[in-house]
Amino acid sequence: MFSTIVDLILPPRCGGCHLAGSWLCEICLRRMRRLEQPLCRRCGAELESPRGGCGCRGRLRSLTRLRSAVAYEGPVESAIQRFKYQGWRRLASPLATLIAERVLVEGLAASMVVAVPLHRDRERQRGFNQAELLAHELRRRTGLRAPPGRLLRIRTTAPQVGNDRLHRWQNVKGAFEWRGPQLSGRSVIVVDDVATTGATLEACASALNEGGAGPVIGVTVARVRI
């Protein structure tokens, strides 16, 4: 509650550098590094060479594509930390704009937008779900709608930070469930703040596929290079 009040009454300050005037200043926006080609056509990871591979095909079975706007470093890392852990909710708008630009550039088509859910206990503790704020703003920018049901995190999972690749996948396997009418082959964009291995987005895509979804595309603000 306190963070919400502070967010409403304080003037905008850049989430990247704390400069007053806007939630993301032009200098920080220019400093954010867009992911560079060559990229994996499936998961969007940066590759060493056009002929290289990242090995994602054996892991991403439900997620059709994964795309991130920028690299998780510098100003965007600071902004996401403030957004996620310090309650700077107004950052949802400029961060979602970065996602929307990537969706447009990539020509990513879908029928609806859904957020990666938090478990209810963690959302109660934090006070909000940062991915839902991003998804809401992305819907506003794209005109896509929310789904006719809910994607739920049905069990608590340990934070992914610090886990190696194997434990990330094991941690979220079976952690999500679609509750609502059958999605009848409709395509879905799933939104999160940061992607590392894509394990969380893949687990969400699996649950959506079980609910009848067609292609599921994961999008995030930033991507961690591993």
Label each region the model flagged.
Residues M1-I226:
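Glycine-rich phosphate/pyrophosphate-handling loop used in enzymes and phosphotransfer proteins
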